Amino acid sequence: MLRYGFLAAMAVLVATPVMAQAPACTPAVADSELVKSRTLVMSTNPTLPPLQFVDAQGQLRGMRVELGNEIARRLCLTPEYIRIEFSAMIPGLAARRWDLINTGIFYTEERARMMQMVRYENQAISFSAPRGNPQNIRTTDDLAGKTVGVELGGFEERRTRELSQSLQAKGLQPMNIRTFDNFAVAYQALRAGQVQAVTSIDGVAAEYDQRGDFPRVLNGLFPTPVSFATRSRVLADAVVGALEAMKADGSLKALFDRYGASIYTDKLDVVGPQ
């Protein structure tokens, strides 16, 4: 398995234009809906191999990066990425620093009241342990009293805290939850023995397991679709159109199959404030 190099921490914004010039066609989204003329500016937290990561040459890679590039191409826009921690993404979207959150943001009704969301992928929560699973974590009850690392501010943190509360309700010890700026730092803490498990998503935990780094000891928890998120209803509708076209010509399935990901099976649509 190829070992991917990726950023351990990203405190500074890094803009990555993927193409030097805009495509020679008519953009499907007006400049008035965009942060930058003829450009689809997307935020990503590239610490989630194989879905989004930075390779040894410093280039953005992964399924969601490829998907964002293809959507931009079909909308006749130049893709550009800003690498940023997840906790800054929703405020940055509101401040018009980027057009689209392309980081696999989990769909929730609360978020859909703030942003236009397009569900496109099914994901779930996993827990990873150190090699050999020394704490013998086999069920969620085995997480009682354990020190667990998770990325700050996301769905994963929320679900980890809910699970900890459910353990307490059963008379078990709560988890000692430690938050980190991103998943890469959380996994580094696991490697260093600072935490006893890490919460992530199925695709990422499976990747670390396949590499032989950290066994995926629990998976498939809290299955929930992940989404694109944007301020603009017009842009969201255009993204749905691009996804529908990819679904119709088979390219969406081919991309997801290549990465072992699961396509959202319900209707592709926009959920958000009118």
List each language-model region with its residue ranges:
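Ligand-binding cleft/hinge of the Venus flytrap
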Residues: 68-75, 156-179, 209-210
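Extracytoplasmic small-molecule ligand-binding "clamshell" domains
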Residues: 22-104, 249, 258
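A ligand-binding cleft/hinge motif common to bilobed small-molecule-binding domains
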Residues: 88-91, 104-113, 159-166, 188-222
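Short helix-initiation/N-cap motifs at beta->coil->alpha
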Residues: 65, 81-91, 135, 174-188
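Extended ligand-binding regions for polar small-molecule ligands
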Residues: 22-24, 65-74, 133-134, 141-155, ...
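Acidic, polar ligand-binding/catalytic clefts
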Residues: 69, 73, 78-142, 213, ...
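Alpha-to-beta junction loops
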Residues: 41, 77-78, 95-103, 146-147, ...
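Periplasmic-binding protein-like
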Residues: 46, 122-129, 202-244, 262-274
